[in-house]
Amino acid sequence: MGDPKLPRRMWRKPKRPFNYDLKMEELRTLGTFGLRTKRELWKAHTELSRVRNQARSLLALGQEVRERKEPVLLRSLARIGLVGKDASLDDVLNLQVNDLLGRRLQTIVMKKLGFSTPYQARQAVVHGHITISDRVVTIPSYTVYVEEEGDIKLTGGSAFATILEKSKRAEAAAREAAAEAAEAEQAAAQAAAPTPAPAAAAPKQ
């Protein structure tokens, strides 16, 4: 059972921690999702492994028991947006760690509210600028339920509202400037193109 004061570790290190390709892949994932340490990534891998093991265990059961237990697992995963309503155990086995990391509050806040980087979104979450159904959530790794996505917003009077508005205006101005530069470049290229010589008249017979 173990001592309740000393809970079990929630993550496992990779079997080949010094593999170069693995380390590079981990660093890319950390940057993509704004993770603070590799431990956050290892927790996601451990949770994904647990879910896959549940799916494999169900595949090994008899038909009657499987039909009773399989919908329970699929419904729980559908609630957090990992699989669709019509998913099967094969879809569960095909899940990747990026799918799980994509359901973190930090990731969804970045996409939904328009933060420029995942680290900026993490800062907003940690400092209490994000609410879900009028409830302040300060945990970047919080797994967002599908029905909660529409209730994610900035707290009233948050300084990030001004920051995001300025960022959106700057991005719009940059896109407009890039479009104007492309049009000017295209016009200059057309003006510099040599004019084709007129076709010579056919000799008279």
UniProtKB/Swiss-Prot annotation:
**What ranges does the record list as Low complexity composition bias?**
179-205
Q: Domain S4 RNA-binding spans what residues?
A: 103-173
Chain positions covered by the region annotation Disordered: 174-205
Q: Name one GO molecular function term.
A: rRNA binding
Q: What's in the GO CC field?
A: small ribosomal subunit
Short name of one Pfam family: S4
Superkingdom, natural source: Archaea
- Keywords of this entry: Ribonucleoprotein, Ribosomal protein, RNA-binding, rRNA-binding
Tell me the protein family, please: Belongs to the universal ribosomal protein uS4 family.
Whom does it interact with, and what assembly results?
Part of the 30S ribosomal subunit. Contacts protein S5. The interaction surface between S4 and S5 is involved in control of translational fidelity.
In Swiss-Prot or TrEMBL terms, this protein is called Small ribosomal subunit protein uS4
Q: Which gene encodes it?
A: rps4
